[in-house]
Structures are given as C-alpha cells and as structure tokens.
C-alpha cells in the first residue's frame, strides 16, 4: 500500500500488527495520531468491516481529522466507523440502550453550566452556605467520584471522604450528591460523567448488551491513552475482552488530563491486563 511508504520502520510495524493487544508508546510530535489513522486505514484495506472498528479520541478535532483523512482514502465507507471522543461514542450507545436504565432515548445531556445551575438550586433548597458549597467545586468533587465509580451510596459510607468534607465545613456533601443524582434522573438528563458511568453500568448489569458490543467492536483503538481515566479504561477493557484486538497509543511522558482523574497507571496496568501485548516504541 503506497500509504505505508510514508511511515518509518517502527510505525509500519505498529500499523500492520492488527491482531492481539498492541501498545504504541511515542513522544510528543512523533505522529502518534497519524499511526492510529493509518492503522484504521490498514484495517479497512485488509477487508475489515468499518462498523466493527471503534476508535476513541480525546478531542472532537482529533476525531474529525482522522475521519476526514480516512474518508479521503476510502470514501463514504469511512462514515461507518465508530470514531469519536469517549463521550460522543458512549452517548451514541446510550441513546439506543437508555430505556434499560430507565432513561428516555432522547435523554438530555447537561453541560457543566447546566450541572452547576442545578447544583446551585439544590444548595439553595437545602439551605446550605453557597460560599462553602460552590457549584464548581461540588461538581468537581462529584465528577471525581463518578470517574472512580463512587456513587452517592458509596460516598455516604466512605469515611475518608466524609471526614474530609467535615474538615472542610461541608458535612452535607453526600446529601447534595444524592439529590443531584436523583434530580438528573428525574429530568431524564445525564451530565458528561454520566455518559461514561451509565455506559459502565449498562455493560455491568446487562450481559446481553455487553455481549453485543464485545462482538460488534472486534477492533478497538484509543488515542492519547495516557489521558484515559479509571472509568474510561474499565469500559474499554470490558469491550475488548473477547477479541483482544485492542491498540492503545500513548506517551508515557505526558498526561495533560491529570485533573480529570486521568491515570498513568493505565499504561502500567495495560501490560498486566493484556499479557500478550506487543509494545512498539
């Protein structure tokens, strides 16, 4: 394939190694996303159905660039790829499965402003000090918990979190979290973190749904793997468990999303979770 002539030896090996778990570690500016793009193109060139390829990115811009590049090479077939950010791909899955979790398929997605406004209302209704329970801080706290699979019930009995809240003069944090969760559900709404959390719940609670997506996505790829957090990795690990054709592209020297609970541990865990992994540097 002429396309591959532009790759160096290491990149070529990473692109053409399409079976089994693969980790591609490269520094900034070394064309990591390009490797992933070529890998998708190579899969399609090898006759793999684009509908069975899941490629996850961190920004809409990266997803758009990859999709456009592949469309230039393969035309409209590229539109069948499941390619986008974690949030956009998971919201697409949730739209078709939401009823199982008691949500309408046209559930609303709250952005951070919507979420903060709801929290402001809850704090006011509970008669709490809005200087202590600032919506931005409360949302950050809830977000961190959701991304570590700590729901309102688990929060309420977590002695570390409770004593931290009490020490900071916020003893009602668990109750705020509980009310926030209830109100979102009642409104048929999910916030950004719910798009991950509810996908995880869906795959955990419904083996038939897990089976469906495990067998749909025979090839899974993640860009900027060092930026994935515990929850994102948990979901993708479940999906890739059957075919094990998972490729992650990461840079062990940078983690720009650390504030989202992103975890360098994922890079280390990957080798443990997928012992057959081939690593390319």
Region roles according to the model:
Residues 1-105, 109, 211, 265, ...:
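P-loop NTPase Walker
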Residues 18, 78-81, 99-194, 217, ...:
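ATP-hydrolysis module of ASCE/P-loop NTPase motor domains
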Residues 275:
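Conserved N-terminal phosphate-binding loop of PLP-dependent enzymes in the Aspartate aminotransferase
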């Amino acid at each position: 394939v002429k396309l591959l002539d532009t790759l160096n030896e290491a990149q070529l090996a990473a692109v053409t190694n399409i079976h089994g778990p693969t980790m591609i570690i490269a520094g900034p500016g070394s064309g990591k996303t390009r490797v992933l793009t070529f890998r998708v193109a190579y899969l399609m060139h090898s006759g793999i159905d684009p509908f069975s390829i899941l490629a996850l990115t961190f920004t809409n811009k990266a997803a758009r660039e990859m999709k456009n590049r592949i469309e230039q090479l393969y035309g409209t077939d590229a539109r069948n790829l499941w390619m986008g950010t974690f949030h956009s791909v998971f919201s697409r899955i949730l739209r078709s499965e939401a009823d199982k979790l008691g949500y309408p398929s046209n559930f609303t997605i709250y952005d951070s402003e919507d979420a903060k406004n709801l929290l402001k209302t809850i704090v006011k209704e509970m008669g709490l000090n809005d200087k202590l329970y600032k919506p931005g801080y409360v949302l950050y706290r809830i977000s961190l918990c959701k991304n570590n699979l700590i729901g309102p019930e688990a929060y309420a009995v977590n002695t570390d979190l409770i004593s931290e809240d009490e020490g900071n003069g916020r003893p009602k944090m668990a109750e705020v979290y509980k009310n926030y969760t209830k109100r979102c559900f009642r409104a048929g709404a999910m916030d950004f973190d719910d798009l991950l959390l509810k996908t995880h719940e869906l795959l955990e609670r419904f083996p038939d749904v897990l089976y469906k997506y495990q067998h749909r996505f025979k090839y899974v790829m993640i860009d900027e793997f060092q930026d994935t957090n515990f929850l994102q990795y948990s979901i993708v690990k479940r999906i890739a468990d059957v075919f094990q054709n998972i490729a992650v592209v990461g840079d062990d020297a940078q983690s720009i999303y650390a504030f989202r609970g992103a975890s360098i541990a994922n890079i280390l865990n990957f080798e443990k979770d997928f012992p057959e992994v081939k690593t390319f540097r």
